[in-house]
Amino acid sequence: AHVERIATRPRPAGSAQHDLVRDGLVAALGALSLPVERQVTTVQQGTAAVRAARVENLMVRLKGTASTGAVLLAAHYDCVPAGPGAADDGSGVATLLEATRAIKAGPALSNDLIVLLTDAEEFGLLGAQAFVEQHPWAKDVRMVLDFEARGTSGPSQMFETSAGNGVVVSEWASLVPRPSGSSLTYEVYKRLPNDTDFSMFKKLGTAGLNFAFIGNWERYHTPRDSPGNLDRGSLQHEGDAAVVLARRFGAMDLGALQSRDAVYFSLPLVGVAPRYSTVLALPLAVGAAGLFVLAFVIARRRRETSIGGTVLAVIVYAVFVAAAGLLGWRSGRLAGLLHARWLPEGNVLMGGWYAATLVGAIATLWLALYALLRKKFNAHSIAFAALFVFVAGALATSWFVVGASFVLQWPLVGGVLAAMALRAGWEVPPGAGPLRAFIICLTAAPAALIVWPLVSLVFVAMGLAPESGAAIGVLTALGLGALSVQTEVIAQGRRWWPAVIAAIGTAACLAVAVTETGYSSRDPRLVNLLYVADADARTAQWTAQTIPRGVPQDRPRAGWPDPWLRQYLGDAPRTGRPDALVQPWSAATGTPGFLSADAPVVELPAPQASLVSSTPAEGGRTVTLRATPAGDGHVLSVWVNGARAIDVSIDGKRIAGQMPARAANDTAWSLDYVNAPASGTTITLTLVGVTPLTVAVVDRSAGLPEIPGRTFAPRPASVIPIQAGDQTVVRRSYVF
């Protein structure tokens, strides 16, 4: 019920719907007989390109009986303008409301519990930043549990932790039902530019865990992130984690949470999550390598392999792994060439079937290659060749990327044990053959439970974009190499049959993928339409992004303009952004990926800027401007150009940090202000030189204006907005 009330309509920060949802959350928390703390403040980040917002965070605090600090449960209650945000992050808010109710109904916790609903996460984590930097409760936090979503289904993944996570990971693995997550995602996330509110909380230097479910990621930040599409099992899994972990950390000494990082991974078919200290990673890798050497020496003494044959096979297998990664890198592009029906980040429609085709193609190549190699090498040489790559990878990851070491270590152990069980010619006592075959199949468990689920996870998380395609290709090749002994068992002398069967399956997957006839309500096209008005020139344009973000600009664009867009753009739209959208430092109006056409001019309120003062300063002047939004716009932008700013204050708050060192002719400065006061904002800039200052003020509001005398067909279900959604943009320029 919480999700249905929260996610009826989009609620971006600063919107009327956002305020309605906020008031409803205050009432829901108040119904628990808890006093609600409201943090209303302004916050800003950046120097040359500043983001700012008026935010209103909501929080409650349950006092502990013998507190050693506070446990913080966090989720954000705003969402993007394009969709209602049932999963992102209505699910997190609902989780916290129910967890608070359950915990309050039970025995009192020893530690304090803070429940924080942040504002303006989608605009740059500004609500979380305001809490961390400005609220007095922040200094009490010792443990953070953050709940997010990047899809509408799937298990709640624990995808990020704080440093020194051994204790908190152990509690997660032992308490949460069907734990899902691994230290691999922790290592990957540390190297990505992605952020959630948890990124701000980590600045507190506290322990923490970050959760999100990611299934059906294509619904993320679109109208399809709706209550009807939200998997209740995902919501329940998130809620289970919140309650058990809040209770556990609420009873622990929060001063004793720091420890060495852990290597951890979940086994999805088993429902457990093994974990051990990173200190053990290198000794385990060395031990696995030693087991490999022992097995190889035994095989050599039995004349079951040779050094020369194994070296040649190592080269062949390493080339195969690299080729599989390259094929995966190009797979999304190749699929796009077949029908050019693109999704963001280089993904394509029917991506699941194309991913299955990719895996099948790599499997077919490996099985065919295996059959060819068996004409020259015996099974042991091929197995040890693949395992040698695992040895090198296990040692390297255990030293450089410790959290990823389990991906290669445990399949290596299983592969070595399988190779030791394999005997040339299968000359064994009667009755021993089936037992050995069973043992060999059992040793496939590490690869089956670790490597192959990662192939699926990568696709679910990132689709078939180039980077994820490459990862899928490499993981598939590694998974096949780890099972080379099992391949020998399955083939049983019929070496070409596995390749033939894999080829048939691959062809079937490709046939299903290419039958996609077009965008539909099940697989919609993602298009944002903007009405862009230049208040100075009294002109207006329609503009639409025609190639999704991350898609190669030289790829074909099937069916453009879309039939629905033709009523706005006509049959011969221009390429590029309208002038009113071009910032002083951005590319020219020929920017690819956009289509534009003239639009009827509608009388719309325009944002305003005025010069409050201009006084001499050493080497230049100090200018104070007043920028005022047009009305109830979502974002007020101020773009300044013409003189380099060396010091800036917004509403009396000096921007923290040094202005970046830039080229002398780089004079651009910008502010994007979410939920700006209707009375306006004051900007003071200390400038180098006294050259005229060009100032553009831009007001962005959700939705499109009514056009007198024109009626447009509504969006079909096969064409939907994403992220910022449809917008009305009004720009006015000044020279001061």
Feature annotation, model-predicted:
Residues K139-M158, A281-R302:
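C-terminal domain-closing interface element
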Residues L267-V286, G346-A355:
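Juxtamembrane/start-of-transmembrane alpha-helix segments at the extracytoplasmic/lumenal side
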Residues G287-S586:
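Alpha-helical transmembrane segments of integral membrane proteins
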Residues D23-A49, A53-R61, V93-A94, S174, ...:
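Extracytosolic and intramembrane catalytic regions of membrane-associated proteins
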Residues F131-Q134, A251-L254, E516-T517, D598, ...:
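Intrinsically disordered, low-complexity boundary segments flanking structured domains
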Residues A82-A86, D112-L116, P177-G181, R495-V500, ...:
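A generic short-segment signal for beta-strand/edge and adjacent turn/coil regions
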Residues A1-V3, A105, P136-W137, A273-L280, ...:
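General structural signal for secondary-structure boundaries
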Residues A1-P274, S637-G642, D647-S649, K653-G689:
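Soluble extramembrane regions of membrane proteins in the secretory/endomembrane system
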